[in-house]
Curated annotation (Swiss-Prot):
Native organism: Staphylothermus marinus (strain ATCC 43588 / DSM 3639 / JCM 9404 / F1)
Coiled coil: none
Entry's family note: Belongs to the XPG/RAD2 endonuclease family. FEN1 subfamily.
Residues the entry annotates as binding Mg(2+) 1: 31, 84, 156, 158
Annotated protein name in UniProt: Flap endonuclease 1
Enzyme class: hydrolase
Cofactor: Mg(2+)
Amino acid sequence: MGVNLKDLIPEEAKMTIEDLRMLRGKIVVIDGYNALYQFLTAIRQPDGTPLMDSQGRITSHLSGLFYRTINILENGIKPAYVFDGKPPEIKAKEIEKRRKIREDASKKYEEALRKGDIEAARRYAMMSAKLTDEMVQDAKKLLDAMGIPWIQAPAEGEAQAAYIVSKGDAWASASQDYDSLLFGSPRLIRNLTISGKRKLPRKNVYIEIKPEIIELKKLLEKLGLTREQLIYVAILIGTDYNPDGVKGIGPKKALQLVKAYKTLDKILKIIPKTEFPIEPEKIVEYFLNPPVSTDYKLEWRAPDESKIREILVEEHDFNPERVKNAVERLVKAYREHIKSKQLGLEAWFS
């Protein structure tokens, strides 16, 4: 889920990307689990049923990964994906919370189907989506065939992506979660994999979702905080490591407290008595110094057309003609854009 910093992001620290070609030549490290989960929840039949092959295996994530990655490449962006490793022990409460939410949503989905409430069924189906190890392995195989690099993180993928960007090996990390900023990513791109028109829940209203870039340096300057103090704010609101946060404290109140008292010790003394699942100091330390791998390569290769067809058409029953056309687009994008020089937004970020 990540921490909810949305209401604290000032306009001066973010920029809407009206055209993905503005990111042409940029290397962007995408949170793989985050992206696959988005595809898994969004790409569904009207009643909430995911796309499946003839053997009943879910393919929504592969469809989203394949076509969206091609779209990203066609705009001259050089994508790489990073995947979560073993979740840290301090995340156990959040993982259990998510499991219960999925179980409850699954029951409500079945009930909605029995009642013929298609809209509710779709909503609960999305909430009950689960990303399995098999799905992740299939995604990695597809990326290999497409010639797209991926990195296996030892723990949190967002931390690994932030490390790669902070080392200068990529221009930005991409995720829906603001945790990337807490892990120190200089730039975070949101909505990269889900841009387009989306229907609002329970309303017959569609909104246009566009990618946006948040720059950590500008964010901290505008808020008047250090990165460590931003982590304090997140802890008060609630993170994946203390999902309940502090009762009665929302984003704006948390910001006020941190700016007034500045240190964690002073903040903890004045807030309502709270039982943290783990010492707040350990949460701070994890965000500042998470486990990351220094052994990674960002190398793009020519697509393996026959392997892509084998995975999508032969193994998972994708439409042969549609895959053929998409592969042609992929090959063209690789030839035209993958080696292009970084252009675009230096002026805005200088």
